[in-house]
C-alpha cells in the first residue's frame, strides 16, 4: 500500500533541509505504516519552552536549524504512539535515506531517552 503526505505534513516541513524533505517524501511511498510529520523547524524560543516543560532535554536541537523532523504513526486516520509501529516507519525512512545517499540518525537508536518519532540529518555530514 502506498501512502502520501498530507498538506499539513508538507507545511510542517517548511524550513527543513531539502535533503531531509526528500527522504520523507520518498519514505512515505514505501512505508508499511502511514505517518505524518508533526514537527520540523523550531524557533530557539519554542525549543527553550519545550526544555522548561520537560518535553526536550537540549537547547541545541537539530530542529532549530531545520535538520530534524518528528513523525507520528497514523492507523485508520488516528495518531498512534504504539512503540512497535516506529521501527517499521524508521526502516522505510532509513531505506529512503540510503537510496538518496543521505546520512540520518534515528532517535529510536539513541542509547538514552529513545525518541522513536525523531529523525535528524547526521551532524558529521550536515553540520
Give, region by region, the residue ranges found by the protein language model.
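Active-site acidic/histidine clusters and adjacent loop/turn architecture
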Residues: 1-36
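Catalytic cores and adjacent binding grooves of peptidoglycan-active enzymes
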Residues: 57-127
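Extended, low-complexity, intrinsically disordered C-terminal regulatory tails
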Residues: 25-53, 99, 104-107
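Short linear motifs at secondary-structure transitions and domain/linker junctions
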Residues: 10-14, 44-50, 94
